């Protein structure tokens, strides 16, 4: 025995003897337990010496654990002792057996997780596109449709928010460039974003080529060539090459490199789409910390910063920008806290948890005598124990010193002890805490829903009386009793009368007995013990007590004792006929808000006719009975107009509410379903049923807080009484939130049914349900009934009228048969005259039919609808439209069917060219069995060619296929590989086509001509040009050749652009089979270089015909008016008599410059030495310059370092304008978004060019942002803000905005993009307009002012030079500039001047100092009196 006792050495034995057998018990482990354990081990055939080590104990635990479930009490005790010993060996402190067992459980769970993790790591992820086959070769498996579909969904749902980048990164794990291109192509519809991405890829590819020059000489045999930039982008490399690079030794990870480039581009796109700075992310006062952290990291991912900077942001900004409550907690945690610790510490601060805690505290006060801790969740808290024997707190009956009470401690009866007592416990305190009204709850699963407190009511009724209508009122007395209705938003407390005494009690359907506190009742009582939440309480039982509850009387047993709250249990509630009722669908409401800063609609009700008022009154009375709408009082200030229309083919009326105003003010919703399901994507099913949900919207409750905004009024005839006011309790028809909320609720409701029946396919679109399965029809129908039951439980009816059990099924406008589908029969109307509305409907029907009838065309029918016509206008059919309609009628006569999708077979798409820019296509798996067909007739640009259109068709089909089937079909295209290659090499960045093969179905797609890339030796060179006069619309076009030929033709009703094209046409007509053409028109060059083969312009079509006939054509561009030989000659030829010539030398140059820059008369007079009258005549003759100049008044600070900034809007874009106040010089730029980031960047650029001391802006959010403040601080710029709502404080920049817009208007047609026009206008304003002080242009003036400022700063040193400066100044209240005066002295804040022998001191901000160059001022000695005359 001694040997066995030596299991533990001295120190460990002490620890062993401190451990308690039970939590809170007195007994502890002793030496005897070790001796007993070693003996027991021998009984179980285990070696007792195992007890001496940690490892040994672990082995014993492993052996015993498996037998625990079936083992005896001794075995369990042995196991417990060994577990405690295991921890003593490891010198880990445990206080009692339970803690040791808990620790072991935790340890085992952790090791199990690690095992699972290891196992998971061993399995290869399916997303790695390059895998090794059995032969050991590296092969490529294409990205799965699921991956592509996930990517498309990400872009559709998130647009380009920051999450897109990690999602892209995860989905493209290990992908090859070809896979990455597939991913990009599936979202090719986002053209602006893709263009940005393309630019980034091209830049990166060029940079790669620069850093990795090609090695000279041939590549040694067996060695791979090195990838170029375009190889990495997957455009000039094959899939095999990509795999070889990626798996070679050493590898070139082309996939990863390309992915990095794409992520760079995505970063740019994200910055454009969600320009939020991390500095702007602050936690709201009531925002849960977890939500704030999510927003913070979402923005952090989009920030352009190194990882170190991001780490710093996380450490400092996260805490700094949290709200005060969380900040206090986080600071207490100290700087080293992990994110997990922060989240745990701040859990529930400010969120709904606050309310829960307050409720819990209130509850604990009410039930402080009756708390029982659950298991050991609250370690360390002492529970209050109460003695059953004497009733005192602080000890239990076993340790009670008072004499033992006779009988049972539970029921008080003699003859048995408590452990043998059979008396039932009274579950008296089973009150569910309902959340406060309007608090968002988690959507519980349907099992828990059955007893959730969401929207139930307690009704009290007697006997089997039918329930009267909700809300009915008591009328009269006696038997016409109406029963109260009690909602469960608050605890159902009611006033009761017991034996004549008034009390308040809780109606508790979960308690068996009725228990009251502190009430004296007559008659005999029996002692009784009942079990409550906090243990047992002693009560007195009174029988046959009359109780009155809510006017209903009952007689029953009442228990009286120390209950924390008076309870009416089921023994009385059942007598009263009290029921739990679920009214309108128990679906939880979706919280809805108005747009920030907006209030509800207040639109007056318009007058209605008597019959409409009657109809509406009837409809609303019915709806009110059904609980769909409720009457409201005058306290609701909102209103939406309501009217009535007759239902189609019936005498019944229908109520319509005009929710347009409310829709404008309601928050935006995410469109839950992006399109409608298509039958071609359905898999073939044995049994099918189609259901329709009745009164769909009216089954879903509307958010309680939002209901007030749906108020409407039914007026009375002749206003004899005030209108009746109602508001909606359910989703209204016509409100913009209804579809999204309905679909969201429907999806949640179907979720448990779908999970329970995975073999059943349910397609849900709004209220149409398609249910398919491979079950036998009997079983299938049973499932359908289960589904209908399930929907009914949630308040959705599925009317038998619209329940389709037998094929053909009519669903979503389609007709479904067991093995094929078609569109529902289409009738094309026969009419002698067609209105716009008729043709719109006809085109709609044909469009719908085109998904299954191949060859339908509608181009000429659509042409009839061009221009703004009224719906009722009669439109004559053109001959082409008649023919098109007749062809379509023939096609539709023969019914055509589509088949269903078979996932085991490949998809094939075949495309045909129909001519006239129309294309048709079929998608099938077996020949002649089409899944679906379609047509394409979009023209994305005015001048296009077939190859470009073909790629557009392919991309449309690819996107459509991913949506319907989740994968891309193989394409069969009517184009030869060579033709495609030729075109594609030029345009690879813009397009990508998936796997395809050539199919010879005429007409084939071909490139009709090709332009040479180098001049053609020996061919004649034609210099072409054209000119037109804007007013007379007369023009000339012509050419001059290097062989001395020339030709000019006069044109009428033309424009500059047309004459340029006409000149090219002339050159092509008059030249041989090979020709070089030189033009100075970017416009003409741009059109022809894209190799169009058709155009909306007749002239371009004629040029195309000429180009097709030539063998070789080279087209090149030179800048105009730069004295280039042939170009200058032809320019003179076509200009004579067209561009206006006045009667003086130098005028033509001035006029030409004016046509380009619209400079003012002063600039022309000075630059071309023209008399003012002639210069003014040029301006007067320009139709774009006949706008009045605007005078500037008001007193503005004119110090040299001050700039005013403002944003203005034009063509839907934002222009940021900066004006140098003293000179009127402008800097302006089109910015992508009105954000602090863009503004700060602009300010830094400005500060890098000019000395900026002060910027003066309005209070726009971009100017007041922290980013701008930081930029100003860094550049040492002082920021001043204007007076809110007083545009005058921004006067200079405001008037410059107008001026700039005026100039842009004059030259807008010279530039394609607004950003170009803005820079042209800035140039014109700064250098081509003269006037104002000194007769300078703004550009000359700013340089003069800055130079002068530098010189005058040296004034004190060189006081003698001061006489050379002149000062223009303003007096205090007079806005007119005076001067010039002599400068005597310049200080920091003021200048001293001499004006007509009078010496004055003028504040620095009211003076402009200019060097006197002895130049003649425009005007006499005072310029300022004249405003600019431009």
UniProtKB/Swiss-Prot annotation:
Integrase catalytic domain ranges (all copies): 1196-1346
Composition bias, Polar residues: 445-454
Record text on activity regulation: Protease: The viral protease is inhibited by many synthetic protease inhibitors (PIs), such as amprenavir, atazanavir, indinavir, loprinavir, nelfinavir, ritonavir and saquinavir. Use of protease inhibitors in tritherapy regimens permit more ambitious therapeutic strategies. Reverse transcriptase/ribonuclease H: RT can be inhibited either by nucleoside RT inhibitors (NRTIs) or by non nucleoside RT inhibitors (NNRTIs).
Site for Cis/trans isomerization of proline peptide bond, residues: 217-218
InterPro entries recorded: Aspartic_peptidase_AS, DNA/RNA_pol_sf, Gag_p24_C, Integrase-like_N, Integrase_C_dom_sf_retrovir, Integrase_C_retrovir, Integrase_cat-core, Integrase_Zn-bd_dom_N
Pfam families assigned: Gag_p17, Gag_p24_C, IN_DBD_C, Integrase_Zn, RNase_H, rve, RVP, RVT_1
ZnF locations on chain (Integrase-type): 1145-1186
Region span, Interaction with membrane phosphatidylinositol 4,5-bisphosphate and RNA: 14-33
Interaction with Gp41, as annotated region: 7-31
Gene Ontology, cellular component aspect: host cell; host cell nucleus; host cell plasma membrane; host multivesicular body; membrane; viral nucleocapsid; virion membrane
Binding-site positions, Mg(2+) 3: 1206, 1258, 1294
Domain of life assignment: Viruses
EC number: 3.4.23.16, 2.7.7.49, 2.7.7.7, 3.1.26.13
Domain Peptidase A2, residue spans: 503-572
Catalytic residue positions: 508
Catalysed conversion reaction: Specific for a P1 residue that is hydrophobic, and P1' variable, but often Pro; Endohydrolysis of RNA in RNA/DNA hybrids. Three different cleavage modes: 1. sequence-specific internal cleavage of RNA. Human immunodeficiency virus type 1 and Moloney murine leukemia virus enzymes prefer to cleave the RNA strand one nucleotide away from the RNA-DNA junction. 2. RNA 5'-end directed cleavage 13-19 nucleotides from the RNA end. 3. DNA 3'-end directed cleavage 15-20 nucleotides away from the primer terminus; 3'-end directed exonucleolytic cleavage of viral RNA-DNA hybrid; DNA(n) + a 2'-deoxyribonucleoside 5'-triphosphate = DNA(n+1) + diphosphate
Zn finger region (CCHC-type): 385-402, 406-423
Site (Cleavage): 128-129, 359-360, 372-373, 427-428, 435-436, 483-484, 582-583, 1022-1023, 1142-1143
Gene Ontology MF terms in the entry: aspartic-type endopeptidase activity; DNA binding; DNA-directed DNA polymerase activity; exoribonuclease H activity; lipid binding; RNA stem-loop binding; RNA-directed DNA polymerase activity; RNA-DNA hybrid ribonuclease activity
Region (Interaction with host CALM1): 8-43
Positions of region (Interaction with membrane phosphatidylinositol 4,5-bisphosphate): 73-77
Binding site for Mg(2+) 2: 1025, 1060, 1080, 1131
Motif (Nuclear localization signal): 26-32
UniProt keyword annotation of Hydrolase present: yes
Protein name as it appears in the record: Gag-Pol polyprotein
Organism this protein belongs to: Human immunodeficiency virus type 1 group M subtype F2 (isolate MP255)
Lineage: Viruses, Riboviria, Pararnavirae, Artverviricota, Revtraviricetes
Gene symbol of the encoding locus: gag-pol
């Amino acid at each position: 025995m001694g040997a066995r006792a030596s299991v533990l050495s001295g120190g460990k034995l002490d620890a062993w003897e401190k451990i308690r057998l039970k939590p809170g018990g007195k007994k502890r482990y002793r030496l005897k337990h070790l001796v007993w354990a070693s003996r027991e081990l021998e009984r179980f055939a285990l070696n007792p010496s195992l007890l001496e080590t940690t490892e040994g104990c672990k082995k014993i635990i492993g052996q015993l654990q498996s037998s625990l479930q079936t083992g005896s009490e001794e075995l369990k005790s042995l196991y417990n002792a060994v577990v405690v010993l295991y921890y003593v060996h490891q010198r880990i402190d445990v206080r009692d057996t339970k803690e040791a067992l808990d620790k072991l459980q935790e340890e085992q769970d952790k090791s199990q997780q690690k095992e699972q993790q290891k196992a998971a790591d061993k399995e290869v992820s399916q997303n790695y596109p390059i895998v090794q086959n059995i032969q050991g070769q590296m092969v490529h498996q294409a990205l799965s449709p699921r991956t592509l579909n996930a990517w498309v969904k990400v872009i559709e749902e998130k647009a380009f928010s920051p999450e897109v980048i990690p999602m892209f990164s995860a989905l493209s794990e290990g992908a090859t460039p070809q896979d990455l291109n597939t991913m990009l192509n599936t979202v090719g519809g986002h053209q602006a974003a893709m263009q940005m991405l393309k630019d980034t890829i091209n830049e990166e590819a060029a940079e790669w080529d620069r850093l990795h020059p090609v090695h000279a000489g041939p590549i040694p045999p067996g060695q791979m060539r090195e990838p170029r930039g375009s190889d990495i982008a997957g455009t000039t490399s094959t899939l095999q090459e990509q795999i070889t690079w990626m798996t070679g030794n050493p590898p070139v990870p082309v996939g990863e490199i390309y992915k990095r480039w794409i992520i760079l581009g995505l970063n740019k796109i994200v910055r454009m789409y969600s320009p939020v700075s991390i500095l702007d992310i602050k936690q709201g006062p009531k925002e849960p910390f977890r939500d704030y952290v999510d927003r913070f990291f979402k923005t952090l991912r989009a920030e352009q910063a190194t990882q170190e900077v991001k780490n710093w942001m996380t450490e400092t900004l996260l805490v700094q920008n949290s709200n005060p409550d969380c900040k206090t907690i986080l600071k207490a945690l100290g700087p080293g806290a992990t994110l997990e610790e922060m989240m745990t510490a701040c859990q529930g601060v400010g969120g709904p948890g606050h309310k829960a805690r307050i409720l819990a505290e209130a509850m604990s006060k009410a039930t402080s005598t009756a708390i029982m801790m659950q298991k050991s969740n609250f370690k360390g808290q002492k529970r209050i124990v109460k003695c059953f024997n004497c009733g005192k707190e602080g000890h239990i009956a076993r340790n009670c010193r008072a004499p033992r009470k006779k009988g049972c401690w539970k029921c008080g009866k003699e003859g048995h002890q408590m452990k043998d007592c059979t008396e039932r416990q009274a579950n008296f305190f089973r009150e569910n805490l309902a959340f406060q009204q309007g608090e968002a709850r988690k959507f519980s699963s349907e099992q828990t829903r059955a007893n959730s407190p969401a929207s139930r009511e307690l009704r009290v009724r007697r006997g089997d009386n039918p329930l009267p209508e909700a809300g009915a009122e008591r009328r009269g007395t006696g038997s016409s009793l109406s029963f109260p209705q009690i909602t469960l938003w608050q605890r159902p407390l009611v006033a009761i009368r017991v034996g004549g005494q008034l009390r308040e009690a809780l109606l508790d359907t979960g308690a068996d007995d009725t228990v009251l506190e502190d009430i004296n009742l007559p008659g005999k009582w029996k002692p009784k013990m009942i079990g409550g939440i906090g243990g047992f309480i002693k009560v007195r039982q009174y029988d046959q007590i009359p109780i009155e509850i809510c006017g209903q009387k009952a007689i029953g047993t009442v228990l009286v004792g120390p209950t924390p709250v008076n309870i009416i249990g089921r023994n009385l509630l059942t007598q009263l006929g009290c029921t739990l009722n679920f009214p309108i669908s128990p679906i939880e409401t979706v919280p809805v808000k108005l747009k920030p800063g907006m209030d509800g609609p207040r639109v007056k009700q318009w007058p209605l006719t008597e019959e409409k008022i009657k109809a509406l009154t009837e409809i609303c009375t019915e709806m009110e009975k059904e609980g769909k709408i409720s009457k409201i009082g005058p306290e609701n200030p909102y209103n939406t107009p309501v009217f009535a229309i007759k239902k189609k083919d019936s005498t019944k009326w229908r109520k319509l509410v005009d929710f347009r105003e409310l829709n404008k003010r309601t928050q935006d919703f995410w469109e839950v379903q992006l399109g409608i399901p298509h039958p071609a994507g359905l898999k073939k099913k044995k049994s099918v049923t189609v259901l329709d949900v009745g009164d769909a919207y009216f089954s879903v409750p509307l958010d309680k807080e939002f209901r007030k905004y749906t108020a409407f009024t039914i007026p009375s005839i002749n206003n004899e009484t005030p209108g009746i006011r109602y508001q909606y309790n359910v989703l209204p028809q016509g409100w913009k939130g209804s579809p999204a909320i309905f679909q969201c609720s429907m999806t949640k409701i179907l979720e448990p049914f779908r999970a329970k029946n995975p073999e059943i396919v349910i397609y849900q679109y709004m209220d149409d349900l398609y249910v398919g399965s491979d079950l036998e029809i009997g079983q299938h129908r049973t499932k359908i009934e289960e589904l209908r039951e399930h929907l009914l439980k949630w308040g959705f009816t599925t009317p038998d009228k619209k329940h389709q059990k037998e094929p053909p099924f009519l669903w979503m406008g389609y007709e479904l048969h067991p093995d094929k589908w078609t569109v529902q029969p289409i009738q094309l109307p026969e009419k002698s005259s067609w209105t716009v509305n008729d043709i719109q409907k006809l085109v709609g029907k044909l469009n719908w039919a085109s998904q299954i009838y191949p060859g339908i065309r509608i181009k000429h029918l659509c042409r009839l609808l061009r221009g703004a016509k009224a719906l009722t206008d009669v439109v004559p059919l053109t001959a082409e439209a008649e023919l098109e309609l007749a062809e379509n009628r023939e096609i539709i006569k023969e019914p055509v069917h589509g088949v269903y999708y078979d996932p085991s077979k490949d998809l094939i798409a075949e495309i045909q060219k129909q001519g006239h820019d129309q294309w048709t296509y079929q998608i099938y798996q077996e020949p002649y069995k089409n899944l679906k067909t379609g047509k394409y007739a979009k023209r994305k640009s005015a001048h296009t060619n077939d190859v470009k259109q073909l790629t557009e068709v392919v991309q449309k089909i690819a996107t459509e296929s991913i949506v319907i089937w989740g994968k891309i079909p193989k394409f069969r295209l009517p184009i030869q590989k060579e033709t495609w290659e030729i075109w594609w090499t030029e345009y690879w960045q813009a397009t990508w086509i998936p796997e395809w093969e050539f199919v010879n179905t005429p007409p084939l797609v071909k490139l009709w001509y090709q332009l040479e890339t180098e001049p053609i030796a020996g061919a004649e060179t034609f210099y072409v040009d054209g000119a037109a006069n804007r007013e007379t619309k007369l023009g000339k076009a012509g050419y001059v050749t290097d062989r001395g030929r020339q030709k000019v033709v006069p044109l009428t009703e033309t424009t500059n652009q047309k004459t340029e094209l006409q000149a090219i046409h002339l050159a092509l007509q008059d030249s041989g089979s090979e020709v070089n053409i030189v033009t100075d028109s970017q416009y003409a060059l741009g059109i022809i270089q894209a190799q169009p083969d058709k155009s909306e312009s007749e002239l371009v079509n004629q040029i195309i015909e000429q180009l097709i006939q030539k063998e070789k054509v080279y087209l090149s561009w030179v800048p105009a008016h730069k004295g280039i030989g042939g170009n200058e000659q032809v320019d003179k030829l076509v200009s004579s008599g067209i561009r206006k010539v006045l009667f003086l030398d130098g005028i033509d140059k001035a006029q030409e410059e004016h046509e380009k820059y619209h400079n003012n008369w002063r600039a022309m007079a000075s630059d071309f030495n023209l008399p003012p009258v002639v210069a003014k005549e040029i301006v007067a003759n320009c139709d774009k310059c006949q706008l009045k100049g605007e005078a500037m008044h008001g007193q503005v600070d004119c110090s040299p370092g001050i700039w005013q900034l403002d944003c203005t809007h034009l063509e839907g874009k934002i222009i940021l304008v900066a004006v140098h106040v003293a000179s009127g010089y402008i800097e302006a730029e089109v910015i992508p978004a009105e954000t602090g980031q863009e503004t700060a960047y602009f300010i830094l650029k400005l500060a890098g060019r000019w000395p900026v001391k002060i910027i003066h802006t309005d209070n726009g959010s971009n100017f007041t942002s922290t980013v701008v403040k930081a930029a100003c601080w860094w550049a040492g710029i002082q920021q001043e803000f204007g007076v809110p709502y007083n545009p005058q404080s921004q006067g200079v920049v405001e008037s410059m905005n107008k001026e700039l817009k005026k100039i842009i208007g004059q030259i807008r047609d010279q530039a394609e993009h607004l950003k170009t026009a803005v820079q042209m206008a800035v140039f014109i304003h700064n250098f081509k307009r003269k006037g104002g002080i000194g007769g300078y242009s703004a550009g000359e003036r700013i340089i003069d002012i800055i130079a002068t400022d530098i010189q005058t700063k040296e004034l004190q040193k060189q006081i003698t030079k001061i006489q050379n400066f002149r000062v223009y100044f303003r007096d205090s209240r007079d806005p007119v500039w005076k001067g010039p005066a002599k400068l005597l002295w310049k200080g920091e804040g003021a200048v001293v001047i001499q004006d007509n022998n009078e010496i004055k001191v003028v504040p620095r901000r009211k003076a402009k100092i200019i060097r006197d160059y002895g130049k003649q001022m425009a005007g006499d000695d005072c310029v300022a009196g004249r405003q600019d005359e431009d």
